[in-house]
Amino acid sequence: MDTNNNIEKEILALVKQNPKVSLIEYENYFSQLKYNPNASKSDIAFFYAPNQVLCTTITAKYGALLKEILSQNKVGMHLAHSVDVRIEVAPKIQINAQSNINYKAIKTSVKDSYTFENFVVGSCNNTVYEIAKKVAQSDTPPYNPVLFYGGTGLGKTHILNAIGNHALEKHKKVVLVTSEDFLTDFLKHLDNKTMDSFKAKYRHCDFFLLDDAQFLQGKPKLEEEFFHTFNELHANSKQIVLISDRSPKNIAGLEDRLKSRFEWGITAKVMPPDLETKLSIVKQKCQLNQITLPEEVMEYIAQHISDNIRQMEGAIIKISVNANLMNASIDLNLAKTVLEDLQKDHAEGSSLENILLAVAQSLNLKSSEIKVSSRQKNVALARKLVVYFARLYTPNPTLSLAQFLDLKDHSSISKMYSGVKKMLEEEKSPFVLSLREEIKNRLNELNDKKTAFNSSE
């Protein structure tokens, strides 16, 4: 007779092979079920689901199908002709109390200076702000997980720490960690053979907050450990909040099962700030750094420095330092001179590949999707934006650009470029205006990385 472990594999294999169950459905639902041999009988198959939502969903949507599959197939447990299927919520796993965790040490990873009160809210980030506040204020997760994504320096880390600080005020156990630190800690415990302590540390908390989630990709052992950490936290209704620079589907090399779990709850994009929000940020940073700038200088910074909040703060400090060194008063002319190098457009000389990647990341598409003509609106817009930025920043002739985008008629390039240019000049689409800034920021980042790499060779 088959062992219980083989029975479980055999039952789940039957489900996976059934044509009525897609691979996505199997991964999202059935792969999480655990067969309970102790409760099962000859005519009843018992399974454990990690949480009530999954339990209810499978019972309602797939209960009849499960009974049909198991009734028609003889498996090692010798199921009767007519089989009843029961799915229950798994009992919560108790973590060994001997792992004496110093939560005070864990709390120090939350930066006290980042709060909801000093987060500048605008139309670009209002949705993210409201979701974050609701998550922080709720005793049980309203959405789980929550994933915020967007370009560098837009306030994602601030909002993550704000959630942590609010949760700590309610005496919740909070773990905030970057994926890099999570990896370092994982390897240390692995080498020391203290994985029980590692699991207790990250799974026995009320809020698990992970920054730079995109860096989990390409590390199979780490992804495996995070997968199980995620599952246990989720099963025990512990709030998970993830931060990434791109949407889950655009994290190349990340396991599909993790991408799937990242999208279980709610995903929201942090957009680049509009001019009004940028000016509010500049004023706030001046106040925090106790620096007084004339109104016209603050407006100049908001208009001419990138959307990266850290760069805006750097510009403020640079003006103040230079004014002190030169014993000069701060005015617009001084600001223009001091900030000249910060206004350099690093997008100049971009490769077509980098432009394609920047557009793809900004619109949550795959590069391969953009290179093929499509009637989908977001793909069509992406192709136009690739043309627009290629004409601005690359020396590529029209013919090679047409070949790059698989266009038979290279005269279409001029039409696509003119269409985007007109849209931007007339300012009829705030969305496209915002996209232009985001794509430029991503190009700057990609080109800066390339420059840094070349200089190190």
UniProtKB/Swiss-Prot annotation:
GO terms for biological process: DNA replication; DNA replication initiation; regulation of DNA replication. ATP binds at G153, G155, K156, T157. PROSITE patterns: DNAA. It holds the Pfam family Bac_DnaA. Residues 113-323 are annotated as: Domain III, AAA+ region. Estimated to be present at about 3000 molecules per cell (in strain P1). Belongs to the DnaA family. Plays an essential role in the initiation and regulation of chromosomal replication. ATP-DnaA binds to the origin of replication (oriC) to initiate formation of the DNA replication initiation complex once per cell cycle. Binds the DnaA box (a 9 base pair repeat at the origin) and separates the double-stranded (ds)DNA. Forms a right-handed helical filament on oriC DNA; dsDNA binds to the exterior of the filament while single-stranded (ss)DNA is stabiized in the filament's interior. The DnaA box is 5'-TTATC[CA]A[CA]A-3' in this bacterium cycle. Multiple discrete DnaA-oriC complexes can be seen as DnaA levels increase. Binding of DnaA to oriC is increased by HobA; some chi-type structures can be seen by electron microscopy. Strand separation requires the DnaA boxes and adjacent DnaA-trio motifs but works equally well with ADP or ATP. NCBIfam families: DnaA. This is Chromosomal replication initiator protein DnaA. It comes from Helicobacter pylori (strain ATCC 700392 / 26695).
